[in-house]
A protein has these predicted regions:
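Small-residue-rich hydrophobic transmembrane alpha-helices
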Residues: 53-113, 150-169, 278-341, 345
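Membrane-interface helix-loop junctions in multi-pass transport and translocation proteins
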Residues: 177-211, 342-347
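Signature of the first transmembrane helix
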Residues: 17-78, 82, 243-266
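Helix-terminus/linker motif at the lipid-water interface of multi-pass membrane proteins
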Residues: 35-54, 123-130, 186-192, 256-283, ...
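Interhelical loop/hinge segments that connect adjacent transmembrane helices in multipass membrane
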Residues: 1-23, 202, 213-255
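Alpha-helical transmembrane segments of multi-pass membrane proteins
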Residues: 130-153, 280
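Short membrane-interface helical motifs at transmembrane helix boundaries
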Residues: 110-141, 332-349
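Mid-bilayer segments of alpha-helical transmembrane spans in multi-pass integral membrane proteins
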Residues: 105-113, 117-121, 143-151, 177, ...
Length: 349
């Protein structure tokens, strides 16, 4: 492991420099991830139709709920790994890695089974109509088939960042984005798979990125790597992961509930086109949220490591700096959406 990839620099390098090194790759990855979500909408809108966009919008709460469970493990594991590394407890950090893998498999399988059986009632509850249910069902069923992959991919990416490889985490996300954007038009227009093609493009791209992550953590020379003895779930580690990840989980859950309520209201008072329009607005807002989340993801390893090393002033410094950047990005997003809203929306139709 090079000095640049060593987590030890988290306790010595200037905070501003560290936040730049860790946040920029995360921002690029999160922004690209948001852009490929927007690309899904653009390809589906032009290749399938407006009702398909409405169907896609109906899946947003369920995908957000899946992301909530992903953040429950991913954010908790990322922070706990950083704390363990700050304490120089490398064996403990490896056990967190093993527990992340098992937890993601368990939660992913449980989530998939539950919602495959309840998919239609859930989508109708979210605001689906007879015109949009087939699009939402076709898309979400395939996404659920790949849900375990999504959970593992998100969890391991979080550990990558915390273990000193923010750029590798970025490359994993960028690879998923590029592959998804390449497969989307091929599957939708070339093969004529419609909205199912977009879902398959998403799943396949994440499988490829997950494969790269598994190869990285299989290397015995890495500080954190797969080995015997780390896969048994430890109550202390699981409790630590879930307690840290509970806050972002509840935030995502509340976001999911808000979207459900709005979709149901729009179905009653605006119809399918109104739901589609709201879906477009959500995708645009999501872009700026992803940038802010990129700063948060860049901050977590720095704050976690220094907390574990008992360098509390550095934890305060990185938190304050991250908050300033977040306010700036949110203000920029607000101004753009107020000044040029029609130009932004035209991309989707």
């Amino acid at each position: 492991m090079t000095k640049q990839n060593s987590p030890l620099v988290l306790g010595t390098e200037p905070i501003g420099k560290l936040l730049t090194q860790y946040a920029i790759p995360a921002i690029i990855a999160m922004t690209a991830s948001s852009l490929y979500n927007m690309a899904d909408s653009i390809f589906i809108g032009h290749g399938v139709g407006a009702l398909a966009i409405s169907g896609l919008a109906l899946t947003f709460p369920l995908m957000n709920l899946a992301a909530a469970f992903g953040s429950l493990v991913g954010v908790g594991a990322s922070t706990l790994v950083a704390v363990k590394l700050g304490q120089k407890d490398y064996e403990g950090a490896n056990k967190v890695l093993g527990n992340v893998l098992i937890l993601n498999v368990v939660l992913g399988v449980a989530f998939t089974i539950a919602f495959l059986f309840l998919l239609d009632p859930v989508l109708y509850f979210f605001g689906a109509s007879e015109n949009t249910i087939s699009y939402a069902r076709d898309y979400m069923r395939i996404i659920l088939y790949g849900n375990v992959v999504t959970h593992m991919y998100l969890g391991l990416n979080a550990v990558l960042r915390s273990s000193g490889f923010p750029k590798m985490a970025m490359y994993a996300t960028l690879a998923s984005v590029v592959i998804n954007c390449a497969l989307n038009p091929l599957f939708i227009f070339g093969f004529g798979w419609g909205i199912k093609g977009s879902a398959w493009a998403t799943v396949i791209s994440q499988v490829i990125s997950l494969t790269g992550q598994l190869i990285h953590f299989s290397g015995p020379k890495q500080l954190l790597h797969f080995k015997k003895g780390i896969y048994r779930l430890h109550s202390e580690i699981v409790k630590g992961i879930l307690s840290i990840g509970l806050s972002p989980f509840l935030m995502n859950l509340c976001s999911c509930l808000i979207v459900i309520l709005i979709n149901r209201g729009l179905k009653e008072h605006g119809g399918d086109m109104a739901i589609g329009a709201y879906g477009i607005v959500n995708r645009i807002a999501f872009l700026f949220v992803m940038i802010i989340m990129g700063f948060n993801q860049g901050m977590q390893p720095i704050a976690g490591y220094n907390y574990g090393a008992r360098l509390y002033s550095r934890v305060t410094d990185v938190t304050r700096l991250t908050m300033r950047w977040a306010v700036g990005v949110a203000t920029l997003g607000f101004l753009l959406c107020q000044l040029v809203p029609s130009w932004i929306v035209r991309m989707f139709t």
